[in-house]
Every structure is written in structure tokens, then in C-alpha cells.
């Protein structure tokens, strides 16, 4: 509640819609409060009943149950020395340096709490399962988890490619997820219809309707600048190159990220 009170009292730094700037943590508390007020449930209960339980995922929720904590992979600060730019960048994005961010995310108190934009614990398989559900128009094993219209509207672009004033890189957003771009974007080359999210340092999860794939890359090595960057770029390149595009009539559903589809708008 104290976080919400601080956010309610915060003054805008620019008129709404003037600048593109990702809210890594703060916006989650506002959206989380909206969900709680509309549904009358806390976020854990809502996610459990809406997604986690019907998709048979034992851990896909905010925080981590005590019985799974011995199995969790802890984060580790890696890459070039943080003072060579990483700390300055993460202070700008998160409000704290690399080691502080790593220490906070490894703390059992972080696993106890609900951080609406920052602490879903899951596995790569379960994250991939979630994006497969989105690719299937919200359907999973005969159960309709989300409506096709919800997914379509969530993937409608809200911006073109612009420099994000928080992340300081070219970004493109939909109403819900981050979007890929052509000729190259967050999820690799020619991923203009892909949608997903960038997590805390070297975590990428997305679905690409053009290629009929979902991808989940979860890493514990936390760095911004390091020798991993060429390999990461090559991985994204190879996924785009090796996974061929499929004809539109073979896709599982309609998505707002496809500029040719306007039937549900």
C-alpha cells in the first residue's frame, strides 16, 4: 500500500503520450491494483485460478512457494564490471545497480511478496506453454484460457519504432506485450508480428505467429554489457532464419500485430 500511495502522489514529468518510456516495475502496481479491485481477488489467486490451475502449471505465479525454493536457480552478476556502464544503466531503468538487483531477486522476502511487474517464477517450459496458448487463440488442451478477442486486442500496436527513454533502445509496443520489428527488432530479424517480453537482463519470451513458434529464454547470468552479446544476437538470428514462415491461412489465430487483420478491431 505504501508503494501505491507513493505512485498516486507522483507528478507526471511530461504530458501523457508525449514520450515512449518503459516502466519496469512501477506500472505493474497500478495494473495489479486494477485487477484486484475489479475481481476482488489478490493477484496470486487471480493468476492461479485463471492461468496456473487450468493449464496445470505448478509454478507460474507471483513469488515462489516454499516447497520449490530449494530448486530455484538464483541470479548471478556477470559480464563486464558493473561500473563500466551497467550500474548507471540499471539505476536508470530499475532504480538500483546490478548487485543490488541480483541480491533483491535472490532474497527469500522477494519470493514471499507480490511484485506485479517483477517476480513471476516459472520454468522455460511453462513460459513456453503460456505463449503456445496465446498462439492457439487462448486455447489449451480443449480449455479456453483467454478469449481470442482479448489476445487480438492485446497485440494491437500502440506505437511505431521509437527510442524508449527508459531502455534507451528502439522499441515497439502493443497494448499488452512488446512487439518485434522489421527488418530487425527485439526478437531478431523480420519479427514484425512477434509479441512477447524482455525480462531482467537476458531473458526473452515471445511468440511469432508468422513462424508458428514460441520461444522462452530464461537465464540467471545478469549483465548488460558482456561477451555474451554476439552469441545472443546470433541465437536470435538463427531462430528467425531456421524457422520458416508459414502461410497466413495456416496460422492458429488472428493477432493485432498482423497489419492485414482488422476484422476484430
Regions picked out by a protein language model, each given a short descriptive name:
Residues 42, 133, 146-147, 217-219, ...:
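Composition- and surface-driven signal marking solvent-exposed, interaction-prone regions
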Residues 1-189:
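Short, surface-exposed loop or secondary-structure junction motifs
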Amino acid at each position: 500500500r505504501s508503494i501505491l500511495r507513493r505512485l498516486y502522489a507522483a507528478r507526471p514529468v511530461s504530458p501523457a503520450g508525449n514520450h515512449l518510456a518503459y516502466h519496469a516495475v512501477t506500472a505493474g502496481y497500478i495494473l495489479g491494483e486494477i485487477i484486484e479491485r475489479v475481481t476482488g481477488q489478490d493477484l496470486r489467486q487471480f493468476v492461479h485460478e485463471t492461468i496456473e490451475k487450468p493449464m496445470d502449471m505448478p509454478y507460474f505465479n507471483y513469488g515462489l512457494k516454499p516447497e520449490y525454493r530449494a530448486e530455484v536457480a538464483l541470479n548471478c552478476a556477470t559480464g563486464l564490471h558493473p561500473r563500466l556502464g551497467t550500474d548507471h544503466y540499471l539505476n536508470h531503468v530499475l532504480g538500483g545497480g546490478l548487485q543490488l538487483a541480483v541480491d533483491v531477486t535472490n532474497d527469500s522476502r522477494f519470493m514471499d511478496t507480490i511484485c506485479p511487474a517483477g517476480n513471476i517464477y516459472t520454468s522455460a517450459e511453462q513460459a513456453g506453454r503460456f505463449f503456445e496458448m496465446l498462439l492457439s487463440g487462448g486455447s489449451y488442451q480443449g480449455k479456453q484460457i483467454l478469449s481470442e478477442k482479448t489476445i487480438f486486442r492485446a497485440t494491437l500496436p500502440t506505437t511505431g519504432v521509437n527510442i524508449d527513454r527508459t531502455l534507451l533502445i528502439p522499441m515497439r509496443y502493443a497494448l499488452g506485450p512488446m512487439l518485434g520489428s522489421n527488418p530487425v527488432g527485439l526478437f531478431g530479424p523480420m519479427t514484425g508480428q512477434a509479441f512477447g517480453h524482455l525480462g531482467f537482463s537476458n531473458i526473452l519470451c515471445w511468440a511469432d505467429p508468422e513462424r508458428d513458434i514460441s520461444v522462452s529464454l530464461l537465464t540467471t547470468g545478469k549483465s548488460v554489457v558482456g561477451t555474451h552479446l554476439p552469441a545472443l544476437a546470433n541465437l536470435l538470428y538463427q531462430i528467425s532464419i531456421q524457422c520458416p514462415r508459414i502461410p497466413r491461412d495456416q496460422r492458429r489465430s488472428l493477432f493485432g500485430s498482423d497489419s492485414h487483420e482488422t476484422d476484430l478491431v
